[in-house]
Regions:
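N-terminal accessory segment detector
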Residues: 1-120, 128-149, 153-170
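Ligand-binding pocket scaffold of soluble enzyme catalytic domains
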Residues: 123
Length: 170
């Protein structure tokens, strides 16, 4: 990415990729929040994070539509160490197919016990962000490979089946 092609990410970094050790901190934080506040409290935290912290990106998505969503996810995963991801922009939706999740991959390589609800965080964050941008979001899979779908309301995505989000495990 050249300096003439700014990233769709809301932050700037001098290194080409983030630090994979962040995944250890995220996993530990989720474990703490779930233990302290329960699943409902953790979900509220993620929803507020999706609406609040990600507000600048959500606004980009609202203004730029599905093209902005696709660009964001391409830039996001380009900065994540170890992920294998395909982003496809279709007329009514964007499909983010995670063939190898960088977080789960790193947690496993580090021998960490992965919070079993870990993969649900992508759903709760994603729904909050999509709704703020006038879109819908669904998630299927997990535990290292999944599919995120961001769609226009006209895409009429089926109701989310929470059973389709696989629990994370070592």
């Amino acid at each position: 990415m050249s300096s003439n092609d700014p990233s769709a990410l809301p932050y700037r970094d001098t290194k080409p990729q983030g630090s994979a050790d962040f995944y250890f901190a995220t996993n530990a934080t989720f474990r703490f929040l779930i233990g302290r506040f329960g699943l409902a409290g953790w979900r509220r935290y993620l929803e507020e994070l999706g609406r609040g912290y990600f507000a600048p990106v959500n606004q980009q998505w609202r203004r730029g539509g599905l093209g902005a969503v696709a660009r964001y996810w391409r830039d996001f995963f380009a900065a994540e160490p170890g992920g294998v991801v395909t982003v496809e922009e279709l007329p009514d939706r964007v499909e983010v197919v995670v063939h190898a999740c960088p977080a789960i991959k790193h947690l496993r390589a580090g021998g960490r016990e992965v919070v079993k609800e870990y993969c649900q965080h992508c759903f709760f964050l994603g729904v909050a962000r999509a709704e703020a941008a006038g879109l819908t979001m669904r998630l299927a899979g997990g535990n290292g490979s999944c599919r995120h779908t961001y769609g226009r309301p006209s895409a009429e995505l089926p109701v989310q089946d929470m059973q389709s989000i696989v629990e994370a495990r070592l």
